[in-house]
């Protein structure tokens, strides 16, 4: 298993900038607003041939508001998972009460871990002199760095990774987990859903829209199958996204969909489906991901024996031609249908990766063409010789014909519907490609 390094410190000391410097990419959200990294964010890195995971925690502070207390709890929870802890302070801002308090917590509760004291933003000789006073924290060997220009970071990484024990050979294997992205508008219950599955308050849960700003990965094992759950910031309409934090969070959610096999799109039962929900669903469909629609907070709805039927009918009308997307009614609060949702997502993942033999497909084609013959176009008749499944991450079927330009949209839709009737592609977009002389016409 790759060692986990955690960055911790009060808000705005430069943890996310250092995170990005170490990974050499813009991964964590960076903004001068204190507390931008509210929850933990983990990414993989490599230095001098050594692989590791780096975790950017929420900023530590002693404010009394509900969200700050939740951030503190999450920070301590995150540190318990780490192999090494990098305690970050700010040379320009000077030592604060929060710095001293956090130093005491680290020395008292995490003395069994590798602790590294980092003074960031040391970008002049004068700041080096002033930073000497930081030994008041009790850490006598500070590392003076500048995450902004990179000075001192290499020496820090050398020492941090040198102090870690060597990972046993062959322990790092290919990821066989099913990748699920939990996406939706803010405050529909995505983090509550993940926490209920994990059985732990692993993500900050608050009724403040947009509490989970970054995409966060968690792993879950069920019935000998591992799942990677990617909990994301809620996707807002672009007009509601501020130039800084919300913009980057929305991009992160879109990237989470690109990483997943199945997008679990969550709705609020009381709010119903909106244009932004349809946009999220279509975003996943366009990227050829599996899709599962969850209606959360179902426990809050007054209902009779036909409520769910009527509700689903309204959803189907709004979704139009996405009849293959399954709908489940769940409650993260009461845990209604949570594991059924997970099992359904697994089945969708399997549907997405299934392969149908060429012999089966051509038998299917023969039977289908016997039912309905393609209409002529400009006096010419479409003739399909055979079909096969093409190699792809999602189901793609190639139809070899005399002229792809003769294929009409209604016949294409007919073939797709027949394929769905014959094989289980629930929750999965499928592509039909009509081929002639190595030229491809895609749907």
From Swiss-Prot:
Residues annotated as domain KH-like: 354-438
InterPro entries: AAA+_ATPase, G_ENGA, GTP-bd, GTPase_Der, KH_dom-like, KH_dom-like_a/b, P-loop_NTPase, Small_GTP-bd
Keyword GTP-binding found: yes
UniProt-recorded name of the protein: GTPase Der
Domain of life of the native organism: Bacteria
A biological process term (GO) from this entry: ribosome biogenesis
Gene Ontology MF: a single term: ribosome binding
Source organism of this protein record: Chlorobium chlorochromatii (strain CaD3)
């Amino acid at each position: 298993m790759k060692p986990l390094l955690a960055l911790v410190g009060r808000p705005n000391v430069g943890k996310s900038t250092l995170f990005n410097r170490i990974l050499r990419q813009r991964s964590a959200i960076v903004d001068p607003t204190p507390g931008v990294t509210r929850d933990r964010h983990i990414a993989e890195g490599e230095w001098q041939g050594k692989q590791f995971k780096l975790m950017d925690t929420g900023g530590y502070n002693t404010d009394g508001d509900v969200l700050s207390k939740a951030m503190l709890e999450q920070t301590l929870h995150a540190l318990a998972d780490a192999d090494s802890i990098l305690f970050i302070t700010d040379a320009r801002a000077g030592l604060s009460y929060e710095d001293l308090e956090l130093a005491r917590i680290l020395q008292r509760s995490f003395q069994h871990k590798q602790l590294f004291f980092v003074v960031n933003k040391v970008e002049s000789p004068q700041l080096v002199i002033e930073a000497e006073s930081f030994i008041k924290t009790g850490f006598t060997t500070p590392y003076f760095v500048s995450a902004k220009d990179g000075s001192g970071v290499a020496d820090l990484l050398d020492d941090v990774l040198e102090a870690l024990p060597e990972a046993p050979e062959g322990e790092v294997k290919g990821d066989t987990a099913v990748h699920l992205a939990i996406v939706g508008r803010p405050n529909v219950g995505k983090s509550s859903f993940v926490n209920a599955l994990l059985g732990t308050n692993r993500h900050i849960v608050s009724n403040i829209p947009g509490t989970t700003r970054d995409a966060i990965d968690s792993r879950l094992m069920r019935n000998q199958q591992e799942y990677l759950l990617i909990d994301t910031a809620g996707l807002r309409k672009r007009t509601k996204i501020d130039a800084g934090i919300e913009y980057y969070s929305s991009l992160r959610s879109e990237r989470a969909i690109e990483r997943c096999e199945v997008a679990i799109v969550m709705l609020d039962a009381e709010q119903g489906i909106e244009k932004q929900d349809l946009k999220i669903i279509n975003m996943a469909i366009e990227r050829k991901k599996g899709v599962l629609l969850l209606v959360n907070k179902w426990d809050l709805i007054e209902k009779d024996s036909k409520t769910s039927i009527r509700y689903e009918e309204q959803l189907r009308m709004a979704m139009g031609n996405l009849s293959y997307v399954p709908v489940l009614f769940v409650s993260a609060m009461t845990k209604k249908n949570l594991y059924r949702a997970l099992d359904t997502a697994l089945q969708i993942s399997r549907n997405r990766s299934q392969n149908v033999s060429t012999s089966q497909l051509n038998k299917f084609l023969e039977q289908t063409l016997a039912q309905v013959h393609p209409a002529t176009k400009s006096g010419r008749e479409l003739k399909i010789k055979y079909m096969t499944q093409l190699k792809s991450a999602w189901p793609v079927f190639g139809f070899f014909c005399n002229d792809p330009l003769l294929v009409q949209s209604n016949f294409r839709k007919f073939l797709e519907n027949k394929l769905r009737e014959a094989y289980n592609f629930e929750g999965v977009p499928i592509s039909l490609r009509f081929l002639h002389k190595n030229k491809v016409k895609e749907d």
